[in-house]
Curated annotation (Swiss-Prot):
GO BP annotation list: bilirubin transport; cadmium ion transport; transmembrane transport; vacuole fusion, non-autophagic
Domain of life (superkingdom): Eukaryota
Modified residues annotated as Phosphoserine in this record: 645, 885, 893, 895, 927, 931
Protein name: Bile pigment transporter 1
Record topological domains on the Cytoplasmic side: 51-84, 128-139, 200-283, 355-410, 456-518, 582-972, 1053-1095, 1139-1209, 1257-1559
Vacuolar side: 1-29, 106-110, 161-178, 305-333, 432-434, 540-560, 994-1030, 1117, 1231-1235
CDD domains, A to Z: ABC_6TM_ABCC_D1, ABC_6TM_MRP1_2_3_6_D2_like, ABCC_MRP_domain1, ABCC_MRP_domain2
Protein family: Belongs to the ABC transporter superfamily.
Phosphothreonine found at: 889, 916, 934
C-alpha cells in the first residue's frame, strides 16, 4: 500500500506511522485510539454510574435521584460547568469536521468525537452531579478519562506544532480554529482533572452522615493506589517531629476489625475440628483466602509485566542497530521507551497494591491467631497448664504467630517464584530456542540436593523452636521469682542456666542452621550462572544465528528476573519449613485438652428450689487429665478395672467424692494437712478438672450448682497490674455505698490511708508493691464486691494477722453484720475459730473425703480413730479459743436466708453506716453486670499512664527522632568490627565480579555480531564461568561472614548484656515494669536481632551497590544522565526526609503497643482460674481484642507509610529507565553514538534500578525500624544497676557473720524516690543469738524490715550494722549469701529438688537429704517419686528417677502446693550455715500440726543463731527473747514479751488481747 492510498478516508490507512521517514503518528491511528478509549470508559463509567445511583450509604433524602439544593457549593457548580464546556468544545470540533470544505475527514474521527461527546454528556455529567450527593470521593473513571484527554490533547498540539505547517494531513483536524479548540480542551481537561484529584468535596450533609455513623470515608482510586491519603499525617508528623495523638491515626479498613475477623476465623477452625480435619491451613484460607488471592493476582500481573519488558528491550536495541533502524522512525524508539516506562509504573502500582493487600491479610491472620491462642490459654485444663508453661505460650504469641504472618505476607514468593521461573523460561525459549533445555537440566540436577538440605533445615528448625521456648520459659520464671533470686543471691546460677540454654543450645543450633542454609544458598546461587553458561554455550554451539546484543541483553534481563526468583528459593524453603513447624506447634496447642465443665449441672434456682443444697457432689472422681485422653485405647466394656490400671492413682486428683453438700446460706469448711488436696477441691467445684464416676459404677457422677454466680479467692492471691479500685471492681459497675462497705469489712481502710494514692494506687505486676496480707484482703474484697451467691475461699485467713483475721471473720464471714452472712461459703482453712461456726466440716486426706460432720458432733465423738477429731484437736490453739469469744456471731442456719438483712460495719474512726436489705437488693440488681466502662474502647496504653500519681506505672520509654548513631555503633561493636569489614569487602568483590560478568557478555556478543558468527565459544564460556564462580564464592563468603560470625556474635553479646543488666536491676524496676514488657524485649526484639537484621543489612547494601554501579556506568557513557540523576536524588531525599520521621515513630508505637498484649497474656495465664470462676472470659477476650487492635492499627499505618514512599521512589526508578532510553536515542547519528551492546548493557542495569530502589526503600525502612529493636535492647543493657555484687576492697570474712548481732541506726527507707518513707528512723539493737519476733498490723512494715536487711531496699538515711560491719559497705552477694531467709512468697523453680536447694553445688547429697527430712518434705517427695508428676505422660525421663533429690519440679513449682513450697524454702534455710535467719511468715500456708513440727525444728536447729520472725500468729513469737512492734513503719515497742505484756497500755498487750492470746 502506498503512503497516499486512502482507506476509509484515511490517507495513510490505520497503521501507526505514515511512513518510516516521518517522525509523527498517523492521525487515523490517533482517532482509533481515541474511539476505543471512549468505548472503554463508556462501559466502565456506565457500571460506576449505576453503582453510584444504587448506593444507599447516604442520608435518606439522597437515596433516590437527588435534586439540587438551594445552595450548592460554588466550586462544584463551576466543575459541572467545566464538564458542560468540555462537551461544547467537542461539539465545536464535530461542527468543524462536518462543515469542512478543504479536507474530507475520515469516519473514524467523527465516530471518536461522537463517542467522547456521549461519554461527557451521558456519563461524566450525571456522575459528577451524583457524586456530590452520594460519594465521599471522586470517581476513578473520571480521573483516568481526563488524564488520558490531557495526554492526547498535548500530543495533538505538539504534532501540529512540529508538522502542521509542512503537512496538514498529519494533523487530526486542520486549521487555526482546531488548534484553539485543542488548547481549550487541554486546559479544560486539566481543570476537571485537578478538581477531581485535589479539590472535590461532597455535600456537607453526607460528610456529617459518615462521621455520625463512625465510617471512615474511602478515597478515590488515584489516592488509593498512590497513597495520597497518607499525606496529611506524614506532613503533620514531620512538622511536629512526632505523632501528636496516636489515637487519631487513620483507621485501617473494615477487613481489619480484629473482633469480627477473629470470630469468623474461630468459626472456621471449630468447623475444621468438628469435621475432624484439624487443618489450620484450611481455616486460614477460608477466612483470608479472598484477600490473599486478590493481592496475589496483582503481583502475578506485575511479574508477567516484568517478563514482557525484556521483549520491548529487544525491540528497542534492534531499533538502534544501523541495519534495522531505517524500518521505523525515531519516534518509534520514543514510544518503545515510553512503553517500558508505563510497564514499570503499572508494575509499581500493582506491586504496592499487592503488598498492602497481603499485609492486610497477614495482620488479620496474626490478630486472629493471637486472639485464638489467648482464648485457648484461658480454657486449658490444670494438667495442660502444667505441661505448657507461660513461656511456651508467650513464645507461640511472639514468635510462631509472627512467623505465620510473615509466611502469608511472602506467599507471592512461594507461588510467584515458580510462575516467574516458568514464564521466564518460556520467554527465553522464544529468544534462544532449544538451548534453554540446558538450563532446565541444570535446575533439575539441583533439586534433589536442595531437597535433602531442606529436610535437614526443617529438623533443625523444630529443635530451634524448642530451645527458644526453653529460653523464654527460663526468662519468665526468672522474672516471676526475681525477689527470691535476689534474697538468695542466686543471680549467678540463674544467669548460668539462662546462658546455657541460649548459648550452648539455641545459638549453637542456630549456627548449624546457618551452615546448612549457606550450603543451600550457595547451591541456588550457582544455578543462574550454570543456566546462563549452559544456555548461551549451547546457543553458540548449535545455532546458526550469532549471539548478538539484541539476544544477550534481553536474555540477561530475563536471567536477572530468573536470578531474583531463584535467589528467593532458599529463603522461601526456610520460610516454609519454619512456618510448618510453627503451624504444627500452634495446631498442637489449639487441640490441647481444655476445661469441659459440661458435667456440671448449673441451675438458676426458682423460689421452690431455694431449700435444696446450693452445691451437691455425688459419686465423682476428679482427674488431672480427661479420661478420654488417658483411656483412648480402652473399650467401653472394661469399665473399672482397666480404667484404674490405665489411669493409675497418680492421675487421680480427688477420689470418690460422695455425698458432699453445701446448703444455701451455709458455711462449709474443708480441712486437711499440707498437700491433702484442699485447693484442688475448690478448683474441681469450679469445673477446672475433668471427672469420671466414683466407686459406684452404675451411678453417673453428679455435680450440681444451684446458683447463677460464683466468686473464688485463691490461696495465692492473683492481683492485676492495675489500681486497688480496679482490682476490687473487677469489671463490675461501681457502687460507692457497697464499695465502701466492702473495703471496710475487708479491713482495707487503714491500708488505703497509707497507700500513696489511696484506692487509685497502682499495685504493680502481681501486686508486687503490696504485702502478702494486703494482697489476700484485696483478693477477698474482689470476691465480696462481686455479690455472688456462692463463695469458694481458699485459706484466706492464713496471710493476715490475728486481729485482721478476727475482723474478717466477724464483718465478712459469720458475724451478725457480716456481708456474706447469708451466702453459701466453702472455705478451706485450719482456723478453729471459724470451724466452730461452720455448719459442716469435711476432712480431706490424699485427695479423698475421709470424714465429715459439724464441729460439736465431731468433738463429742468418743471414737479415738476419728481422723477429723484428731485434726481439729491439732489445729486448736490459743488464737482460736480467743477469737471465739470476741466474734459476735449467730449460728448460721437455713432459716436466716430469707430474714431481713441489716449490715453494720463499725470502724473506730468513722460513724456507723447501715444498709438495709431493700437498699442492698437495689445495689444487687445490677451488680453482676460488667461495667460499660470496661467494654468501651479506651485510649492507647501510652495515653493511660497518669504521671500525677505517685505510683504511676512507668511508661515504656520511646525515643524521639532518628535512631542515634551510637545504636548502630553498639550493634557493629557487638558483631565485631573485623567481621563487618570483611563482610563489606566480600560484598564489594561480589559486585565487581558481577559487573565483570556483564562486560564479558557485552564483549562476547559484540564480537559475534561483528563477525556474523559464534566463534571461540569454549573460551568465552570458560571465562564467563570462572568470573561467575568467583562472584558466587564471594557472595557466599559474604553470607557466611554476616550470619556465622557477625550476626550470631552480636546476638549472643546483646542477649547476655541485656539479661545481666535486667537481673542486676533493683526491685523498683520490676515493680514499675510489667513482666510482659520485659519478655517482649527477650522474645520479639531479640528475634528481630537474631533473624531479621542480618538479611536486611545484606539486601540494603547489595541494593545500594547495584544502584551506584548503575549510576556510574550509565553516567560515564551518558554524562547528561548524571544531571538527571542529581535531580532524582533531590526528590528521593525530599520524600525520604518526610517519610523517615513518621515511620520511625510508628515503629516505636508498634513496639510499645505489642508489650501490653504480652503483659495481658502473662497476667491472664497466672489468673485464669479467677477469670474462669467469675465467668469473665468475654471481658478479658474483649480487652485482648482491644490491645491487638491498637497494635494492628499502628502496623497498618506503618505499612501504608512504606507503600507511600515505595510508590514514589519506584516511579523515580521507572523514570531512570525512561531517561536512559531517551538519552540513548539522543546519541543516534552523533559522534558519541553508543554501540547496541553498550545500550543493551546500560538498559539492563537501568531496568534493575527500579528493583534496587524498591529494596533500598524497603530495607532502609526495615533497618530504621528493626534497629529500634537494638535500641530497645541497648536501653535494657544500660538499666541502672543495684549496688555492686562484690566490693573487692571490703569483703567480709568467709564465716561472717560469726555472732549474728544486728543494729539498726536511725534507719529510714522508701520503695521509690517519689514515695513516702516506709520505715522511719528505726533504732534497734539485736544481740547475737537472740530470737526476735516482729509483729504489727498487716502493712505495718514487717516484711519491709527484712527487705532492708537484705538491701533489697537501700537506706535513705541511717545504716544497718551486722557484727560490726555496715552492710552498705559490702557487696550484695557477700551480704545476701551470708544471710538466710524463708520468704513470704515461697518460690520454686523448674528443675529438680536438688537444683532448687543447691544451685551452686555446695552441699553433699547427705546434707541435702537431711535438710529435706528436717523440713518434713520427705513424705511428699517420696509420694511424687513413686508417681508421675500430674499431667506428665513421659515415660523415659521420669522412669529413671529413683532419688527424692531428682524429683522433677514444674515451672513455678506448680506441682507443689503453697505449703509444700514453704517447706522447700525451709530446707534451703536449713542448708545455709548463716548465723542470721529471717522467717517472713514462714508457716502461714501449712496446717497447725506441721507448723508446730516446723517451729520445733527451727528452735532445735537454729538455737545458736539470731532469728527474726515475722508472724501473723503471735503465739509463734511469744517465746521470743524480744518483740519488735511496728506500726506505720516505725518501731513503737521493743522489749521482752513478758515486760510488754506486763504493761497493759502497750500495743503488744492490745494485740495479744484482741487476738485472744492472754487466755
Amino acid at each position: 500500500m502506498s503512503s497516499l492510498e486512502v482507506v476509509d478516508g484515511c490517507p495513510y490507512g490505520y497503521r501507526p506511522y505514515p511512513d518510516s521517514g516521518t517522525n509523527a503518528l498517523n492521525p487515523c491511528f490517533i482517532s482509533v485510539i481515541s474511539a476505543w478509549q471512549a468505548v472503554f470508559f463508556l462501559l466502565i463509567g456506565s457500571y460506576q454510574l449505576w453503582k453510584l445511583y444504587k448506593n444507599n450509604k447516604v442520608p435518606p433524602r439522597f437515596k433516590n435521584f437527588p435534586t439540587l439544593p438551594s445552595k450548592i457549593n460554588s466550586r462544584h457548580l463551576t466543575h459541572l460547568t467545566n464538564v458542560c464546556f468540555q462537551s461544547t468544545l467537542i461539539i465545536c470540533e464535530l461542527a468543524l469536521v462536518s462543515q469542512s470544505s478543504d479536507r474530507v475527514y475520515p469516519f473514524i474521527l467523527k465516530k471518536a468525537l461522537y463517542l467522547n461527546l456521549l461519554f461527557n454528556l451521558g456519563i461524566s455529567l450525571p456522575t459528577q452531579y451524583l457524586a456530590y450527593f452520594k460519594s465521599t470521593f471522586s470517581m476513578g473513571n473520571q480521573l483516568f478519562y481526563y488524564m488520558f484527554q490531557i495526554l492526547l490533547q498535548l500530543f495533538l498540539i505538539l504534532q501540529r506544532y512540529y508538522h502542521g505547517s509542512s503537512n496538514e494531513r498529519l494533523t487530526v483536524i486542520s486549521g487555526q480554529t482546531a488548534m484553539i479548540l485543542e488548547v481549550l480542551l487541554l486546559f479544560n481537561s486539566v481543570a476537571i482533572f485537578i478538581y477531581d484529584l485535589c479539590i472535590f468535596e461532597p455535600i456537607n450533609e453526607l460528610s456529617e452522615y459518615y462521621k455520625k455513623n463512625g465510617w471512615y470515608p474511602p478515597v478515590h482510586v488515584l489516592s488509593y493506589i498512590t497513597f495520597i491519603w497518607m499525606n496529611k499525617l506524614i506532613v503533620e508528623t514531620y512538622r511536629n517531629k512526632k505523632i501528636k495523638d496516636p489515637n487519631q491515626l487513620p483507621l485501617p479498613p473494615v477487613d481489619l476489625n480484629i473482633k469480627s475477623i477473629s470470630k469468623e476465623f474461630k468459626a472456621n477452625w471449630e468447623l475444621e475440628k468438628w469435621l475432624n480435619r484439624n487443618s489450620l491451613w484450611r481455616a486460614i484460607w477460608k477466612s483470608f483466602g479472598r484477600t490473599i488471592s486478590v493481592a496475589m493476582l496483582y503481583e502475578t500481573t506485575s511479574d508477567l509485566l516484568s517478563v514482557v519488558q525484556p521483549q520491548f528491550l529487544r525491540i528497542f536495541i534492534d531499533g538502534l542497530n544501523p541495519e534495522t533502524s531505517s524500518k521505523y522512525p525515531p519516534l518509534n524508539g520514543v514510544f518503545i521507551a515510553l512503553t517500558l516506562f508505563v510497564i514499570s509504573v503499572v508494575s509499581v502500582f500493582l506491586t504496592n497494591q499487592f503488598y498492602i493487600g497481603i499485609f492486610e491479610a497477614g495482620l488479620g491472620i496474626r490478630g486472629s491467631l493471637a486472639s485464638l491462642v489467648y482464648q485457648k490459654s484461658l480454657r486449658l485444663t490444670l494438667a495442660e497448664r502444667n505441661e505448657k508453661s507461660t513461656g511456651d505460650i508467650l513464645n507461640l504469641m511472639s514468635v510462631d504467630v509472627l512467623r505465620i504472618q510473615r509466611f502469608f505476607e511472602n506467599a507471592q514468593t512461594i507461588i510467584g517464584a515458580p510462575i516467574q521461573i516458568i514464564v521466564v523460561l518460556t520467554s527465553l525459549y522464544w529468544l534462544l530456542g532449544k538451548a534453554v533445555i540446558g538450563g532446565l537440566v541444570t535446575m533439575a540436577i539441583m533439586m534433589p540436593i536442595n531437597a535433602f538440605l531442606s529436610r535437614k533445615v526443617k529438623k533443625l528448625s523444630k529443635t530451634q523452636m524448642k530451645y527458644k521456648d526453653m529460653r523464654i520459659k527460663t526468662i519468665t520464671e526468672l522474672l516471676n521469682a526475681i525477689k527470691s533470686i535476689k534474697l538468695y543471691a542466686w543471680e549467678e546460677p540463674m544467669m548460668a542456666r539462662l546462658n546455657h540454654v541460649r548459648n550452648d543450645m539455641e545459638l549453637k543450633n542456630f549456627r548449624k542452621i546457618g551452615i546448612v542454609s549457606n550450603l543451600i544458598y550457595f547451591a541456588w546461587n550457582c544455578v543462574p550462572l550454570m543456566v546462563t553458561c549452559s544456555t548461551f554455550g549451547l546457543f553458540s554451539l548449535f545455532s546458526d544465528s550469532p549471539l548478538s546484543p539484541a539476544i544477550v541483553f534481553p536474555s540477561l534481563s530475563l536471567f536477572n528476573i530468573l536470578n531474583s526468583a531463584i535467589y528467593s528459593v532458599p529463603s522461601m524453603i526456610n520460610t516454609i519449613i519454619e512456618t510448618s513447624v510453627s503451624m504444627e506447634r500452634l495446631k498442637s496447642f489449639l487441640l490441647s485438652d481444655e476445661i469441659d465443665d459440661s458435667f456440671i449441672e448449673r441451675i438458676d434456682p426458682s423460689a421452690d428450689e431455694r431449700a435444696l443444697p446450693a452445691i451437691e457432689m455425688n459419686n465423682i472422681t476428679f482427674l488431672w487429665k480427661s479420661k478420654e485422653v488417658l483411656t483412648s485405647s480402652q473399650s467401653g466394656d472394661n469399665l473399672r478395672t482397666d480404667e484404674e490400671s490405665i489411669i493409675g492413682s497418680s492421675q487421680i486428683a480427688l477420689k470418690n467424692i460422695d455425698h458432699f453438700e453445701a446448703k444455701r446460706g451455709d458455711l462449709v469448711c474443708v480441712v486437711g494437712r499440707v498437700g491433702a488436696g484442699k485447693s484442688t477441691f475448690l478448683k474441681a467445684i469450679l469445673g477446672q478438672l475433668p471427672c469420671m464416676s466414683g466407686s459406684r459404677d452404675s451411678i453417673p457422677p453428679k455435680l450440681i450448682i444451684r446458683s447463677s454466680s460464683v466468686a473464688y479467692c485463691s490461696q495465692e492471691s492473683w492481683i492485676m497490674n492495675a489500681s486497688v479500685r480496679e482490682n476490687i471492681l473487677f469489671g463490675h459497675k461501681f457502687d460507692q455505698d457497697y464499695y465502701d462497705l466492702t473495703i471496710k469489712a475487708c479491713q482495707l481502710l487503714p491500708d488505703l490511708k497509707i497507700l500513696p494514692d489511696g484506692d487509685e494506687t497502682l499495685v504493680g505486676e502481681k501486686g508486687i508493691s503490696l504485702s502478702g496480707g494486703q494482697k489476700a484482703r484485696l483478693s477477698l474484697a474482689r470476691a465480696v464486691y462481686s455479690r455472688a451467691d456462692i463463695y469458694l475461699l481458699d485459706d484466706i485467713l492464713s496471710a493476715v494477722d490475728a486481729e485482721v483475721s478476727k475482723n474478717i471473720i466477724e464483718y465478712v464471714l459469720i458475724g451478725k453484720t457480716a456481708l456474706l452472712k447469708n451466702k453459701t461459703i466453702i472455705l478451706t482453712t485450719n482456723t478453729v475459730s471459724i470451724l466452730k461456726h461452720s455448719q459442716m466440716i469435711y476432712a480431706l486426706e490424699n485427695g479423698e473425703i475421709v470424714e465429715q460432720g459439724n464441729y460439736e458432733d465431731v468433738m463429742n465423738r468418743k471414737n479415738n480413730t476419728s481422723k477429723l477429731k484428731k485434726l481439729l484437736e491439732e489445729f486448736d490453739s490459743p488464737i482460736d479459743n480467743g477469737n471465739e469469744s470476741d466474734v459476735q456471731t449467730e449460728h448460721r442456719s437455713e432459716s436466716e436466708v430469707d430474714e431481713p438483712l441489716q449490715l453494720k460495719v463499725t470502724e473506730s474512726e468513722t460513724e456507723d453506716e447501715v444498709v438495709t436489705e431493700s437498699e442492698l437488693e437495689l445495689i444487687k440488681a445490677n451488680s453482676r453486670r460488667a461495667s460499660l466502662a470496661t467494654l468501651r474502647p479506651r485510649p492507647f496504653v501510652g495515653a493511660q499512664l497518669d504521671s500525677v500519681k505517685k505510683t504511676a506505672q512507668k511508661a515504656e520509654k520511646t525515643e524521639v527522632g532518628r535512631v542515634k548513631t551510637k545504636i548502630y555503633l553498639a550493634y557493629i561493636k557487638a558483631c565485631g568490627v573485623l567481621g563487618v569489614v570483611l563482610f563489606f569487602l566480600f560484598m564489594i568483590l561480589t559486585r565487581v565480579f558481577d559487573l565483570a560478568e556483564n562486560f564479558w557478555l557485552k564483549y562476547w556478543s559484540e564480537s559475534n555480531e561483528k563477525n556474523g558468527s559464534n566463534e571461540r565459544v569454549w573460551m568465552f564460556v570458560g571465562v564467563y564461568s570462572l568470573i561467575g564462580v568467583a562472584s558466587a564464592a564471594f557472595n557466599n563468603l559474604r553470607s557466611i561472614m554476616m550470619l556465622l560470625y557477625c550476626s550470631i556474635r552480636g546476638s549472643k553479646k546483646l542477649h547476655e548484656s541485656m539479661a545481666k543488666s535486667v537481673i542486676r536491676s533493683p526491685m523498683t524496676f520490676f515493680e514499675t515494669t510489667p513482666v510482659g514488657r520485659i519478655i517482649n524485649r527477650f522474645s520479639s526484639d531479640m528475634d528481630a536481632v537474631d533473624s531479621n537484621l542480618q538479611y536486611i543489612f545484606s539486601f540494603f547494601f547489595k541494593s545500594i551497590l547495584t544502584y551506584l554501579v548503575t549510576v556510574i556506568l550509565v553516567g560515564y557513557n551518558m554524562p547528561w544522565f548524571l544531571v538527571f540523576n542529581m535531580f532524582l536524588v533531590v526528590i528521593y531525599i525530599y520524600y525520604q526526609t518526610f517519610y523517615i520521621v513518621l515511620s520511625r515513630e510508628l515503629k516505636r508505637l508498634i513496639s510499645i503497643s505489642y508489650s501490653p498484649i504480652m503483659s495481658l497474656m502473662s497476667e491472664s495465664l497466672n489468673g485464669y482460674s479467677i477469670i474462669d470462676a467469675y465467668d469473665h472470659f468475654e471481658r478479658f477476650i474483649y480487652l485482648n481484642y482491644e490491645k491487638i487492635q491498637y497494635n494492628v492499627d499502628f502496623v497498618f499505618n506503618f505499612r501504608s507509610t512504606n507503600r507511600w514512599l515505595s510508590v514514589r521512589l519506584q516511579t523515580i526508578g521507572a523514570t531512570i529507565v525512561l531517561a536512559t532510553a531517551i538519552l540513548a536515542l539522543a546519541t543516534m547519528n552523533t559522534k558519541r553514538q553508543l554501540s547496541s551492546g553498550m545500550v543493551g548493557l546500560l538498559m539492563s542495569y537501568s531496568l534493575e534500578v527500579t528493583g534496587s530502589l524498591t529494596w533500598i526503600v524497603r530495607t532502609t525502612v526495615t533497618i530504621e525500624t528493626n534497629i529500634v529493636s537494638v535500641e530497645r535492647i541497648v536501653e535494657y543493657c544500660e538499666l541502672p544497676p543495684e549496688a555492686q555484687s562484690i566490693n573487692p576492697e571490703k569483703r567480709p570474712d568467709e564465716n561472717w557473720p560469726s555472732k549474728g548481732g544486728i543494729e539498726f541506726k536511725n534507719y529510714s527507707t522508701k520503695y521509690r524516690e517519689n514515695l513516702d518513707p516506709v520505715l522511719n528512723n528505726i533504732n534497734v539493737k539485736i544481740e547475737p543469738c537472740e530470737k526476735v519476733g516482729i509483729v504489727g498490723r498487716t502493712g505495718a512494715g514487717k516484711s519491709t524490715l527484712s527487705l532492708a536487711l537484705f538491701r533489697i531496699l537501700e537506706p535513705t538515711e541511717g545504716k544497718i550494722i551486722i557484727d560490726g560491719i555496715d552492710i552498705s559497705d559490702i557487696g550484695l552477694f557477700d551480704l545476701r549469701s551470708h544471710l538466710a531467709i524463708i520468704p513470704q512468697d515461697a518460690q520454686a523453680f523448674e528443675g529438680t529438688v536438688k537444683t532448687n536447694l543447691d544451685p551452686f553445688n555446695r552441699y553433699s547429697e547427705d546434707e541435702l537429704k537431711r535438710a529435706v527430712e528436717q523440713a518434713h518434705l520427705k513424705p511428699h517427695l517420696e509420694k511424687m517419686l513413686h508417681s508421675k508428676p500430674r499431667g506428665d505422660d513421659s515415660n523415659e525421663e521420669d522412669g529413671n528417677v529413683n532419688d527424692i533429690l531428682d524429683v522433677k519440679i514444674n515451672e513455678n513449682g506448680s506441682n507443689l502446693s503453697v505449703g509444700q513450697r514453704q517447706l522447700l524454702c525451709l530446707a534451703r534455710a536449713l542448708l545455709n550455715r548463716s548465723k542470721i535467719l529471717v522467717l517472713d511468715e514462714a508457716t502461714a500456708s501449712v496446717d497447725m500440726e506441721t507448723d508446730k513440727i516446723i517451729q520445733d525444728t527451727i528452735r532445735r536447729e537454729f538455737k545458736d543463731r539470731t532469728i527474726l520472725t515475722i508472724a501473723h500468729r503471735i503465739d509463734t513469737v511469744l517465746d521470743s527473747d524480744k518483740i519488735i512492734v511496728l506500726d506505720q513503719g516505725s518501731v513503737r515497742e521493743f522489749d521482752s514479751p513478758s515486760k510488754l505484756l506486763s504493761d497493759k497500755t502497750s500495743i503488744f498487750y492490745s494485740l495479744c488481747e484482741k487476738g485472744g492470746y492472754l487466755k
